[in-house]
Each structure stands twice: as C-alpha cells, then as structure tokens.
Amino acid sequence: MGSSPLPLPSRGGSTVGSQSASSEQSNVERLSAEKGGNSSLFAQSAAQALNRDFPGRDISFLLLDAHTGRVLASRWDNPDNPIPMGSLLKPFAAVAYGEQHDYHYPNHTCRGTSTGCWLPRGHGEVDLTTAVAHSCNSYFRMLTAGLTADDVFATATRFGLDRPELDASGAELAGLGTRWRTSPVGLAHAYLELVRERQQPGVRQILDGMALSARDGTGAQVHRAFPSADALAKTGTATCTHSRRAPGDGFSVVLVPADDPQILLLVRVHGVPGAQAARTAGQMLHLIEN
C-alpha cells in the first residue's frame, strides 16, 4: 500500500515532509504541540490521506485528539447510533466488576471451548491483564457471571457509554451478543476517559493489558504494521450491522503512544475478525506517523 508522506505544518507555517532533515518529531508527537490552524491542517491532511489510501466502504474509522477529544478525521455512517461493539466493552465490564468487588480480580483457568472461549485450546492461567490482552472470553464469562445491567449502569454513566438493556446480564455485559450497544463516538471517548483515570483502582491492570495486546495479544498486528511506537490496543468482533450482512465485523481501538496518548484511532472492518481490524489500524497509524 504505497503512499506519499503525510505533511504536517511546522510551527512556522510551512509544510515539512517525513524526509526533512529538520523534522525529528513524528506527526503524532507534533500534534500535542500544534494549536489552532496548524492542528486543523493536520486533521485535514490526515483525513485526505486515510480516505485516499483506505477508500473502501468496508472500513470505518474515527481519529481523535486524545487530549481534547476532538474528532480529527472520520468516515463512519451514523457514529452516534448505538451498535454492538463486541469485546471493546470488556474493559468497562471489568471496571463494573471491580466496583462491586473492591477491585479484587480473580485469576482463572481458560480451557478453551469447554469454558466458552474463542480460542479452542484455551489461554491457560490468566489474570485480568492477560485476559484483556488476549480478549479471553472464558475469563470474562467468569468475571461477569454475577453481574446484572443494574451493576453496570454506574460505570456506563461514568465513562459516557450508552446503558445496556435492562435485562442484560452475565457475558452479555462483556460484549458477547447484542444486549449492550453503544455509539462509536461514545466508546472512543470512554477509552480516552479510561486513560485519564489510569491511576484509579483496576484501570492500571486494564491499560497494562491493552499495552500487552498491542505487543503480543489480539492487537499484535498493530505493532507489526506500526512498529515505531508503543501503543495501547483492544480488539473485538461483533454482530454486523451493515445493510450487506456479514458473519461479523472486526473492531480495534488504538491509542499512541502508550505512555501519553496523543491520538486515538477506532476502526471497524466489515466481515473480518478483530485481529484483522488491528492490522488495518496499524497500517493507518503508520501512514499518519510518516
């Protein structure tokens, strides 16, 4: 997927390409320093580049400034409408569980198909961090077994998510099924809030899991396509809501850099699993970065 470097205005107002000897900062690093018109030019350039190199309508995306929450670029039909988001809801189910159990998270043995996981052979012994990294359905079935929609309402409000259906319970609250729908825009902002609350109980383990996901979990395709920066990633696969139905749609949310995110990218790819959506997200970030 060839492309020309994405230009970003310098502080002096001229444009610089990735080959400029004076350009030692990445576009992502520059975004945190750029204000006003220059930030707007970055957003315009990002939108043009993403739509040029990823033109297919099978790909939906939202690119946000991680500090302000401003949408920098987007191509997503009705992004304010609630839809199933699959395992992207697992971190918030974990927070809801923590609020009910003093943030003590149990370990669990995932035995694969026999304990309801997507990985037939299972993940073995997992804790919250590794369960997030590998999106272990077995762990989250165990974690949410005693949760009801009412238990999740406070967490949904705290992070600005749509509430699950009143009679949703158990694994439905971990994004398995369609009983907890939320809007793509709302979910993107919920992840930004998760990062802002990184010092709160339970959140650190979740973010550590997202960092591990980007390196060696279900989001590892992000790092393979975009190796120049550490990232936070979470993947998911959910029921397709396109008019042209597929068995499912893949989702990936990525924040870079991991230690102080400057941008968030939420991607949906029609008819593929979440790991493949992570690869698309990594390719998009590589384009923006360079």
Protein language model regions, located:
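Conserved catalytic neighborhood of penicillin-recognizing serine enzymes
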Residues: H67, D102-F153, L161-D162
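Glycine-biased, low-complexity coil/linker segments
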Residues: R11-G13, G36
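Extracytoplasmic
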Residues: G56-I59, A66, W76-D80, P84, ...
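Active-site-proximal helix/loop microenvironment
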Residues: L72-L88, L161-Q205
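Beta-lactamase-like hydrolase cores
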Residues: N38-W76, D151
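Second-shell loop/turn segments in exported
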Residues: W76-P84, T115-G122, V126-T130, S138-A145, ...
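Active-site SXXK
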Residues: F61, G69, P82-P106, A131, ...
